[in-house]
Amino acid sequence: MINKLIEKIQKTHAPIVVGLDPMLNYVPEHIQKRAFAEYGETLEGAAEAIWQFNKEIVDATYDLIPAVKPQVAMYEQFGIEGVKAFKKTVDYCHEKGLVVIGDVKRGDIGSTSEAYAVGHLGKVKVGSQQFAGFDEDFATVNPYLGSDGIKPFIKVCKEENKGLFILVKTSNPSSGEFQDRLIDGRPLYEWVGEQVDAWGKEHMRSEERRVGKECRSRWSPYH
């Protein structure tokens, strides 16, 4: 999957990703009015406004950029209607040929981590059938619970030819409270980065890695 992203970057000459992080008060007023006229000032109306704005952003940029990164929590705040808008956004971005990085920052262990991995990158079994959930191309994950939280994602990535971006050093102001703490003279995030690199090498297929490191900076039409 990383090869697909690299190819898209090379084709567009744009090593960037557009964040789709819904903030209703940033959605243009005419889009809000149209959505509220149809669905009322409800969660459904808010989700429709977000979806329509996302669609306009994608329509304006899909041939200029390689990838988008919708932030799932910003959709979840609108309940099930927001989650539906997230899925519609993912599907539409795929239709337009974009790589989709699900900014989900999952970080749990065991069966919970497995469920997150299946839900975002894999397929869930229902009787004799299998269905993709959100079906992003990549997911962001938090490694600070250890390998228990990462290995289920790597397993699904290998099965489905998907990829991960693993948080190593984040840009939030308080990140240094833990990530910069010294262990044997080196900050914790360097140790984590080395482990992420090892996971990537361990699970390479020819020249392709399924695991990448993420050091945070971003731009979004919503900011």
Each language-model region and where it sits:
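N-terminal glycine-rich anion-binding loop in soluble enzyme alpha/beta folds
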Residues: 1-60
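Conserved, mostly hydrophobic/aromatic
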Residues: 18, 68, 103, 139
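Active-site beta-loop-alpha junctions enriched in small/polar residues
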Residues: 19-25, 73-75, 105-109, 142-144, ...
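Glycine-rich, proline-tolerant flexible connector loops at the mouths of alpha/beta enzymes
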Residues: 46, 70-82
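Acidic (Asp/Glu)-rich catalytic clusters
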Residues: 58-64, 95, 154-159
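Catalytic PLP-binding core of fold-type I/II PLP enzymes
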Residues: 87-108
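Conserved anion-binding
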Residues: 108-207
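Positively charged, low-complexity/disordered segments
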Residues: 212-223
